[in-house]
C-alpha cells in the first residue's frame, strides 16, 4: 500500500470558464496557468506521483516546456496513472477537497467524480470530490483563486 498527498493552487484571471475536476464550470473568470489550470487534477496528479515516489507534476510536465501549454489535465492525469500502473499499483481510493469561495462547485461534483473515475479506470465509489470555502478568509475567501488538496491510496495490482 502507498499513500500520496497533493496540493495545487491557481489564481483567477482572464475569461472563464473554470476547468476543475475535468469539468467546465461556468464563471466570469478562468484560472491562470500554463495548462488548463485544473487545480483538482493537478493535486490528484501530485498525490499519485508522490505515492509512487516520482516527484511532482512540475517534474513530468514542466511549465517551462511549450509542449504542455494549454494541456488538457485529464490527459496529464491519464499519463500519470499509466506510470502508477507501470510501478505495479492501482488506485484504492482518491479523496479530493476543493477550496473555493466561488464558483459554486456542488452542481458539478458528480460530473467531476465521473471524469476522475473514468481517467483512473476505477469504480465510482473509489472517488470522492468535495468542496468547501475558507469562510471568506485568505485568497480563496477573497475570490482571488482556488486551492485543492488530494489524497490517494494505492494498492498492489493483483
Curated annotation (Swiss-Prot):
**Which InterPro entries does the entry mention?**
MECDP_synthase, MECDP_synthase_CS, MECDP_synthase_sf
Pinpoint the site Transition state stabilizer. Answer: 34, 133
Protein name, entry field: 2-C-methyl-D-erythritol 2,4-cyclodiphosphate synthase
**Chain sites annotated for binding a divalent metal cation:** 8, 10, 42
Give the reactions, separated by semicolons, that this protein catalyses. Answer: 4-CDP-2-C-methyl-D-erythritol 2-phosphate = 2-C-methyl-D-erythritol 2,4-cyclic diphosphate + CMP
Cofactor(s) for this protein? a divalent metal cation
UniProt keyword list? Isoprene biosynthesis, Lyase, Metal-binding
Family per UniProt? Belongs to the IspF family.
Q: Which gene encodes it?
A: ispF
Q: How does it assemble?
A: Homotrimer.
Gene3D superfamilies for the chain: 2-C-methyl-D-erythritol 2,4-cyclodiphosphate synthase (3.30.1330.50)
The record's EC number reads: 4.6.1.12
- EC class, as a word, reads lyase
Which annotated residues bind 4-CDP-2-C-methyl-D-erythritol 2-phosphate? 8-10, 34-35, 56-58, 61-65, 100-106, 132-135, 139, 142
Q: Which GO terms describe its biological process?
A: isopentenyl diphosphate biosynthetic process, methylerythritol 4-phosphate pathway; terpenoid biosynthetic process
- What is the source species? Aliivibrio fischeri (strain MJ11)
Q: Name one Pfam family in it.
A: YgbB
Co-factor note (free text): Binds 1 divalent metal cation per subunit.
UniProt pathway: Isoprenoid biosynthesis; isopentenyl diphosphate biosynthesis via DXP pathway; isopentenyl diphosphate from 1-deoxy-D-xylulose 5-phosphate: step 4/6
Instruction: Briefly state the protein's biological role.
Output: Involved in the biosynthesis of isopentenyl diphosphate (IPP) and dimethylallyl diphosphate (DMAPP), two major building blocks of isoprenoid compounds. Catalyzes the conversion of 4-diphosphocytidyl-2-C-methyl-D-erythritol 2-phosphate (CDP-ME2P) to 2-C-methyl-D-erythritol 2,4-cyclodiphosphate (ME-CPP) with a corresponding release of cytidine 5-monophosphate (CMP).
Entry's Gene Ontology molecular function annotations: 2-C-methyl-D-erythritol 2,4-cyclodiphosphate synthase activity; metal ion binding
Amino acid at each position: 500500500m502507498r499513500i500520496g498527498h497533493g496540493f495545487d493552487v491557481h489564481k483567477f484571471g482572464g475569461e472563464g470558464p473554470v476547468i476543475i475536476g475535468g469539468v467546465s464550470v461556468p464563471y466570469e473568470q478562468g484560472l491562470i496557468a500554463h495548462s488548463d489550470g485544473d487545480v483538482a487534477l493537478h493535486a490528484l496528479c501530485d498525490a499519485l506521483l508522490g505515492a509512487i515516489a516520482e516527484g511532482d507534476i512540475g517534474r513530468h510536465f514542466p511549465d517551462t516546456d511549450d509542449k504542455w501549454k494549454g494541456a488538457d489535465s485529464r490527459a496529464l492525469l491519464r499519463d500519470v496513472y499509466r506510470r502508477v500502473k507501470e510501478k505495479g499499483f492501482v488506485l484504492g481510493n482518491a479523496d479530493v477537497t476543493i477550496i473555493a469561495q466561488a464558483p459554486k462547485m456542488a452542481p458539478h461534483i458528480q460530473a467531476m467524480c465521473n471524469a476522475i473515475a473514468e481517467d483512473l479506470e476505477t469504480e465510482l465509489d473509489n472517488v470522492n470530490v468535495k468542496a468547501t470555502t475558507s469562510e471568506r478568509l485568505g485568497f480563496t475567501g477573497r475570490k482571488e483563486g482556488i486551492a485543492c488538496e488530494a489524497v490517494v491510496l494505492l494498492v498492489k495490482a493483483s
